[in-house]
Amino acid sequence: MKRKYRRLFVVIITLSIFAGSVVFVLGKLKNNVSFFYTPTELLSSSLINRPNIRIGGMVVKGTVQKYDDSIVFHITDLKNYIKVVYKGILPPLFSEGSWIVAKGKMVNGKFIASEILAKHDENYMPNKYKTNNL
């Protein structure tokens, strides 16, 4: 009988450790389920104080201002907008009206971006096919 109880004890301990690990991992991943937050989600949550946030939205037309050391623009989710300040080289697909994802943090009501990713639509067509009416 001792062997049977010892085996049962080992199985219970193993399952407990496994279940605890699953709960721990899911708890840590809970805040990282979304690749980015919209301006509305960011402004209406406690995420504003986090150091590394990704926000996504459309670059508002007429708001892009280029300076010697930075670029300032607004992004929107068509409900709210956030002012973004970025120091660095912009991706080639960045333009007014395009969708972007910016990584950074909120400081005094402005989003200070450390990285900009430009999004493109899924309907990519190489130039040689655009001219052939395909």
UniProtKB/Swiss-Prot annotation:
Transmembrane segments: 8-28
GO CC annotation terms, alphabetical: plasma membrane
Primary subcellular site in the record, as a coarse category: membrane
Compartments, as annotated in UniProt: Cell inner membrane
Periplasmic topology ranges: 29-134
A Pfam family recorded for this sequence: CcmE
Keyword Heme included in the entry's annotation: yes
Protein name per its UniProtKB record: Cytochrome c-type biogenesis protein CcmE
Gene source species: Ehrlichia ruminantium (strain Gardel)
Origin organism lineage: Bacteria, Pseudomonadati, Pseudomonadota, Alphaproteobacteria, Rickettsiales
Gene it is expressed from: ccmE
